[in-house]
Amino acid sequence: MDPTSKRPPPAASSSTTYPPLPKLEILNPSALPSHRFLRPAKRINEGPDVSHFLTSKAYRDIGVWILQLNHALVPRIIKKSTTVSTSEPTTDGQQQQQQQQQRQQKAEEVDEQQQPPPPPPTDALAAKLQLLRKKRDEQQPTTTEEIKTFPLPRYRDGEGVENQEESESIKKLQRLLKKVEAIIDEAPPDPGPRRFGNVSFRTWFKLLEERADGLLREYLPGGVLRWEQGAGGEKKEEEEGTETETETETEGDSDKKTNEQKQEVVGPLEELKAYFLGGFGSAQRLDYGTGHELSFIMFLGGLWKLGGFEGEENDEDGEVERRIVLGVVEPYLRVIRRLILTYTLEPAGSHGVWGLDDHSFVPYIFGSAQYTRPISSPNEPTPLEGSVPNAPKPSDITKPTAVERYRTENMYFSAIGFIYDVKKGPFWEHSPILFDVSGIKDGWGKINKGMIKMYNAEVLSKFPVVQHFPFGSLFQWEKDPEAGVPVQSVHMQNQPVASAAVTGGVGIPTERPSGPGGVTGTAAPWAQAPAQAPAAGIGAGAGMAPPMTAAPWARSTGAGAGAGVGASAANRFTPFKPAGGPGGAPHTGPPPPESFPSGTPGTASNQFAVTKAPWTK
């Protein structure tokens, strides 16, 4: 087992008090008459728009929601008060005898209170009473600690969660996912030859679009439907073709074609539907990636905002959030994996072999949280290092037998197990970044911290990933008044500046953006022409090899650390800011081509140098 899991760092004292952790705001139903739901629209059309996104209210809400779910999965230390004997251990018979003596003693005490004082006891009786009082005094109250973890619920193939007590809202969402999965049987894959994804996925997606309204009305939690019932005025405006103008863009956007965008007023289900449908891939491109995964996560965030999970649980310690992740997010990932296998969906916005995973990211965040060092208070911050006792070692992901054992209880290993299902060959060869992460020696808390930083840098700060995320009234394009100005970095300078493809429907592009020379396709991130000369120390020229994207926390700290995309923006709230550090998204520029970066001995960056891929020796 992991050495760090046997001797985890000491948890904070139970007497320590912490301020409440940030949570995603739940909208007040009394604001319904004045709240206008908007049809989500595409706003990120070119690279510089990412800079605005990193200062928007939507970005703030995404960060808060991801960390709210993440913190709920961290193991807890449960304190229990018990009464134990300070004498030597006794057998069952001796324990029964002691209990009988205690009952006899209590009866004698009652008799003493009700009857006049007895005559002086004999020596034998006095000795017996003295022995009973001594044993009573040896029974002292004590506090024991129990570690509570949150594994995945047991699944039965084709039947969902087994023997799992869930709230009504979670059960409804599970039934919704079962209905979505059942549509696969109505759209079997096309048997003909193909180079990319199976065209039958478009048939499946069309069926989902046609049934989405009915499915959402039937299976969304009741707390959300009350907004739909009270949105009659907004629906009437929609039918009459009424439109509302959103706030004017920032002053820096004055050179764009228009400073204002018009968004159609709709009902709450119509706004939620955009994020729901966006969570199941692109029918046009026949692909699925982390941007689609983000859309579904924020669909759940929209349900949270509308009170879909409110009032059903005692949520003092993140119980509702845990049920959302374990009871909804994991079943959603299972549906997605079946879609990928059935229709051979292409990775969307992937770095290829140098990406963390072809299709997903959040299971690595939530799965590492499941094995993080336990906390003793609901508001104690997520540990940055250490592991729960008896957790598997991070290096166990390279052992198929260990992966098979843990994939049914942990989201990290479940995602690794899917990689083993679809890829062959040495693990270090097809998944080098995950292989590097397996060398971390500071426990699962260190991995969890790094995954969150990497998510901010490689998902939320990358144009190819976030360009299709739509903005409405639940997740607003409007600037967060507490946001700072994002730092311009090499990544920001290399963002594409050409206008994106024309969009339709819920903001999904109807055609691929044109690449260099008019070639249509999704170019690799490093293939973008730089907007200006590269910074000193960064190689240039047409013959430069594509850079390797190593895990962000594997960088050596020093001048310029944390100066990546959105560094300042991330500093404005706790979610993507490492405790005690400079904060912000890490610098993810290319390392020296001849080897992986090496850092100070005993640090994570040095550990990555030890676990570099074999061909770098």
UniProtKB/Swiss-Prot annotation:
Residues 1-25, 84-169, 230-261, 376-398, 572-617 are annotated as: Disordered. Gene3D superfamilies: 1.20.120.1150. Signal peptide: none annotated. It catalyses: [protein]-peptidylproline (omega=180) = [protein]-peptidylproline (omega=0). Residues 94-104 have a biased composition (Low complexity). It is found in: Cytoplasm; Nucleus. GO terms for cellular component: cytoplasm; nucleus; protein phosphatase type 2A complex. The keyword Transmembrane helix does not apply. The keyword Disulfide bond does not apply. It comes from the Eukaryota. SUPFAM superfamilies: PTPA-like. PPIases accelerate the folding of proteins. It catalyzes the cis-trans isomerization of proline imidic peptide bonds in oligopeptides. Acts as a regulatory subunit for PP2A-like phosphatases modulating their activity or substrate specificity, probably by inducing a conformational change in the catalytic subunit, a direct target of the PPIase. Can reactivate inactive phosphatase PP2A-phosphatase methylesterase complexes (PP2Ai) in presence of ATP and Mg(2+) by dissociating the inactive form from the complex. Belongs to the PTPA-type PPIase family. This is Serine/threonine-protein phosphatase 2A activator 1.
